[in-house]
Amino acid sequence: MSDEEDIDESFEIEEDGISITDARGNSLKAQQIAGKERNLDPEADDLEVVVNFYEAGDGTFQLQLPKLTAVKPVDKVNDVLDFINFDKKVCDGIHSSIKLVSQRDQTGPAPFPKHKLTCAHCDWSFDNVMKLVRHRGVHKNVGVYMCQVCLTLFGHTYNLFMHWRTSCSQTSTTATDIEIQKAETPYLHRNVLNVLGSLNRASQYYCTGGYVFLPSDWCITNKEIVMEKDHMSSCHLCHLPVPNKFLEAHGNVHRGRFRIDGRIYGDYFCHICGTVFIEQDNLFKHWRLHCEEVIAYTPVDQYLSNTELATLAWLVLQTTISQADIECLRVSSSLITEKLAKEHAERHGIANSMHKYYHFPQEIWPLKTFVNLDLVNDAIPISGENSFKIKDPKRPVHIMNLLATACPGFYATGKTFNMICSTKKSESDTKKVYRVILRYTTEGSVIQSYDFTARSFPKLRVDSETPEGVFSHPLADFNVESNEAIVCHKCDSKKLTITFSTEVRLKYHLLRHSESRKDGYHCAICKIIVYNRSHEEHWINDCIPLQKLYRDQKDRECFDAEFAAKCASIIKKLRIRTLIRWKERANEDWVETKQTPDRIGEDFAIKFQVGTTALKTLMAGLEEHYKNAQARHEAYKYSEENFLPPLSTPVVVCFHCGTRCHYTLLHDHLDYCHYWPRNKRLVNEEFHKWKKNGCRNTWRVMKSVAEAMQIEVPFISEEQYSKILDYHTYFCNDTRYKVQDSINNWNDCSTIRDVDLSEKLSVAEIVQKGEDSVMAPEPDIIKNVYFPSARIITDNMLLRMTEINLNDVVQRDPITKEELTGKFKEVQDEQDAILFGDYRAVLRSKGIMVNSISDFVAPPDELAKAKASQESAGQESVDHRNRREREFIQQYMGKDLALEAAARENGRLVEVDEEAEDYELTPKELNARRLVERNRHREMCKTRCEHGEYDYEKFKARQVPINPAKMKERKYLTRVVHESGPDDDVCPDEPENNIIAFSPKYENSLSDFRISAIGFREKYLADDKKKRNGIPIRKMTEAQKGVALDYDTLMARHGGRPDVIMNPAGTVFVGGFVFDRKPTCQDNMQTVYVLRNGYAHRYRIYHCEDTNGIYKFVWPQEQSFDPDSLAKSARVRMVKQVKSPEHMIHHIEEIDESIGHNYRLNRKRRNSETREHELIELDTDDLNEPSTSDGRYSFGHHGYR
């Protein structure tokens, strides 16, 4: 019904003499309520409104209420309510009992039988560590429960109840033993009160229920009070278990009528996690250091004052209220009234229909009421006796529901009402109207006392109405919390429903629940039992040996489980003793034993007994492990500090609900509170699929909702939101936080390697003799350096052998045309897949119509056509070439076969296409041709097996003809050169010498790489089986440590044995590591050391001639590879060191001239003669091998590419 609808004219009530105005405020007359005169123009902080109830003609009940104008909250309010001086309300007999307690011996005789764990301070014994640790609180006097009958103290209520059942002389004799042992706790309380009544002491202790909690001085200043579950109820708004005496104040904190840091009955209560403190400073310290929810919303870059922290805590408390409960909160429902109303509804059997109406108006209990009715069990009758009671199933409406509907919202007007006055119903009233006066006031509001600033970020929420077509789910699913509470069944031993509003709260609760029941463990270094604390905290703060080794606490911040295990292992090998002496046992000396559970709580001293030599050895052995621990710690800090831009704040605001949190926790907040629908069953596959997508479209959806509903929400930028999700994905995929899978073989898990060419490819075209050769500008190949392009390798980019989909073609060697088998074919297929991709899809889209590298080699028919077009070159050069080739054939196949082959084409030997229709080779002729090609290739590759300086001229002899039809594809390969072989004693004008050969860069990236990688893996596996001991790690020099690689780290980082690669610039690529040269390191870069099982195995590195030591670079090989956290590329470093491009080119020339042309090609299996020149492990006698005199390092072939 409209608020502006007219009601009856003004009338008078004879008994009270109260004059009531109409709804419009017309004809206001002076009123007097309970002898108090009211002004015609009430002040803003005090207002009385008349509520009219009447029954309409159709039998429904209606209510009229005039509108209230919005009132601004007062500037200063008093936040001290009637929650103080609780101790004055307790009987004076408690204080007299405390005096008597100090004269009693509280430990008592030890129980029988004797258990294995004995207390260090008394004769009590226990059968497990948890009971012993709990018993220690008795000696500390942390706070005890006193029996009011015999004044005996107990540490826990359970022990007090057992005392009442068994040993209390007064209570145990009031009934039989069986009755007392089976009695419930309420019966025990009543039994104690009866005993106290018989002793004329019942009136003194009735308010405490038979026992008193006595906190000690230490407990008052340092410890929070733990409340028993028997005296707690769950808040219906945030579902927090709240002690009954704090329940009403907790509800007022929700409604903004009591400060969250206010004092309640002498205590300070954390309304977020339910912890009680004696001092306010401890409450603020708790919010800063221990309360998980407040810490999650606290900025890490700012220090909040106590006022700001209290504001932030209150806002965090408000985020625990669901959207539906906010509507109820606007009428400031009473928690105690809710509890009683639920019990009332259960008694009348209508508990399932309570959701149909508002249950609890604001401040009904314990406000002053002048209605003279029980607002809980009875109802105000309207138009008939008991016609408005809640137990009537046909009219499930209570008077409090109408009051709740009538009361204006506190957040809308700034007012609440604090008094209900009723007028007596007149018998002459025929319209069946009943009137109630509600007295509104702003007294008690503390909203303005909070410090709402940008630092405290008030929480904003979207409205409950959802625009059509935006969401497929109700907006309630995207709210902060679900409307239904989550029940914890683990701690509900007494069937007390402990509920939580969010999964995050339940998670923290279960974590604390499990930790409180976790047994102690021994520290492997100091042998002391560490109870209920993390390993890292103990190693950093309390471990005595580590404090002696690393005195500065900052040096111990990087300690982790891996470092502690290494430290304990080295201490054990060196036989360093850690001795313990128990101060309270004078007859015992220093002993080398672990602390036993029976000595928990005893004072002790630790002696770390180590000699000077052993100490130096220990520190030397820990040096490498300490550096690794520091590197792991710094890498973790670097990834957190440098992921977001430096100017951006790490604190972000959730665009759904306005929640303020650290950016690393935003994704978890979205997980638990917004994205995944609560009413949908959680399926692992769907959940991981959803999480993999990152929900990046949610930002746009929520922004459209805010714009459509005109809500001012502090949105973060879309770019920053994407960065946060990227960081969360990187953080979750970090290999340091995952268990490594089984190690795969090198060929089973390929890695994509991008080659970024600095210049485009230029080639020389083949022209006929007598014409000018047209050549593109071709600089010396030695000046060109390629740099691997670092990028993140994801699962989608990795190519495995099982996923490569190429045509089933026979893979042949590009030069000899021999069919490749075994591992060489696998490497060829893999490199083809990496270079050309899937032939059916990727190749056509990129314009590369090839299947493998072999397609770039000219087939015999194309070569024959090219040669036939050049017959005018001259008979003299033809005779010369034919004479050379006949000598080759005669050397291996005999003179007759050579002459016969020469006579086939008018005295000219040519290569014949096997598929040509006009000519067919006999088997002998075919074998002769193949043998000639095989022998020619063998002659060209002989230089790979030789030691010493590399002869660039010999490399030019390896001439590879390029298929003219594939010339347009050359830009996807690498640089090629146009040269003649040095061993060709031919005429300079002969056109046959103008053939194109593959460049050293091409051969290095595609040929030598696969051969050296396979060779490295075979040799490494072979050396692994020998298990030969190398150099002890502690005997390694600084230079040797500079080129050392830990074997376990290699396995953990890469999931398998890595390959070792070297590029033409001398950069060593070792398994995806940045191999930087240190300024203090005098390493000659001839070797690399692999650390395993305490020894360093030395391996020789070939073709590593970076004499200037300018740069080293990484070849990305990890899935979670982060290019920002690695060193800059070689190109960037080089540009920073030179002033101009000309200087840079000159600088590169100087580097490359010192390197030499150390490029080889070997696609065949190496025979037994060359196997000894592969990657070899050196003995310890070869450690002092001097470098070459000119400072350059020339080795054999098969360098690490």
Swiss-Prot record:
Keyword Glycoprotein attributed: no
Domain of life: Eukaryota
ZnF C2H2-type: positions: 117-139, 145-168, 233-254, 268-290, 486-513, 521-543, 652-674
Basic and acidic residues bias (residue ranges): 1167-1176
Disruption phenotype: In the TOR complex 2 mutant background rict-1, RNAi-mediated knockdown suppresses the growth delay and elevated body fat index.
Main location: nucleus
Gene Ontology terms describing biological process: cell differentiation; dosage compensation by hypoactivation of X chromosome; negative regulation of gene expression; negative regulation of transcription by RNA polymerase II; regulation of transcription by RNA polymerase II; sex determination; sex differentiation
GO cellular component, one term: nuclear chromosome
Localization (cell): Nucleus; Chromosome
InterPro entries the record matches: Znf_C2H2_sf (IPR036236), Znf_C2H2_type (IPR013087)
GO molecular function terms attached to this record: DNA-binding transcription factor activity, RNA polymerase II-specific; sequence-specific DNA binding; zinc ion binding
SUPFAM superfamilies: beta-beta-alpha zinc fingers
Ranges where the record places region Disordered: 1164-1201
Keywords: Chromosome, Developmental protein, Differentiation, DNA-binding, Metal-binding, Nucleus, Repeat, Sexual differentiation, Transcription, Transcription regulation, Zinc, Zinc-finger
Subunit-level organization: Component of the SDC complex, which consists of sdc-1, sdc-2 and sdc-3. Within the complex, interacts with sdc-2 and sdc-3.
Function summary: Embryonic transcription factor regulating downstream genes involved specifically in the sex determination and dosage compensation pathways, or regulating other genes involved in the coordinate control of both processes. Component of the SDC complex that functions in sex determination and in X chromosome dosage compensation specifically in hermaphrodite (XX) animals. Involved in the recruitment of the condensin I-like dosage compensation complex to the male sex-determining autosomal gene her-1, thereby contributing to its repression and initiating hermaphrodite sexual development.
Protein known as: Zinc finger protein sdc-1
Organism: Caenorhabditis elegans
